[in-house]
Amino acid sequence: MSVTAIVDYGVGNLFSLASSVRAVGGEPVVTGDPKVLEAVDRILLPGVGAFGDAADKLRATGLVPVLDGQVRSGKPLMGICLGMQLLFESSSEYGRHDGLGWLHGRVESLAEALRGTADEGLKVPHMGWNSLTYADASCPLLAGVPEGSFVYFVHSFYAVDCEDSLRAWAPYGVRVPALVSRENVYGCQFHPEKSGSVGLKILESFLRL
C-alpha cells in the first residue's frame, strides 16, 4: 500500500496509530522531516490536547508550508481527533486560534452548545463509543462500513458550519461531525486506531486512496 507519513510535532499517540497502519498492510513512518513528507504517498495528522497549543507546536516546526504544498499537490491527508479540528479555519478553545484553513468551518465548545438544552446533562468530554449517521455515504472512507457502526470518541470541542465537508456525524445532543472531507483532505473526529474493526476499515480505505 506504499508509505504513509504520521506527522510528528510533539502531539498525539503516534506509535499506536503506526501500529494500526501496519495492521492494515500499510508502511508507516513517523516523521517531522519535510523531505520525507514530500516523498511519501499520503499523510496522517494526529493530535490530542488543546487546539492553540497544537497549532503553535505545528507552526513552530516549520512544517505548515510543506503540508500545505502537499495538500495543494493532491496528496491525500487525514487529520485525526484534534488533527481533524486543525484542518478548519479557527477555534475558540481558550481564546481564538487560527487553524490550517483547508476546510470551511470553525471549532467550538461542546459544553457551550449543550448548555440550556434538554441534553445539558450529557458529560463533556464526549468520551466513548458512538454511532455514525451518514451525510454522504459516497465518501470513499465509508466504503464497506455500515451506517450505524460505532467508533470511539474523546473530545470537548467540535466542528460547526462545516456542512460542505460533512460526510458522517454522531449524535450527542448536537450533530457532532465525525468524518469530513474536501477533495484530498479528510478528517476523523474519532480515533480510528481505537475503534476496532470499523476504525481499521476506515484507515485501510484511506491507505488505498
Predicted feature descriptions by range:
Residues 1-5:
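Extreme N-terminal starter segment of soluble prokaryotic enzymes
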Residues 17:
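Divalent-cation-assisted or electrostatically stabilized phosphate/pyrophosphate-binding catalytic cores
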Residues 27, 42, 76-78, 150:
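Structural signature of beta-strand start/N-cap positions in the alpha/beta core
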Residues 28-39:
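Short acidic low-complexity segments
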Residues 39-40, 73:
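Alpha-helix C-terminal capping/helix-to-coil transition sites in glycosyltransferase folds
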Residues 44-46:
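Structural motif
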Residues 49-126:
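Cysteine-nucleophile active-site neighborhood
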Residues 72, 106-209:
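Amide-donor transfer/coupling interface in amidating biosynthetic enzymes
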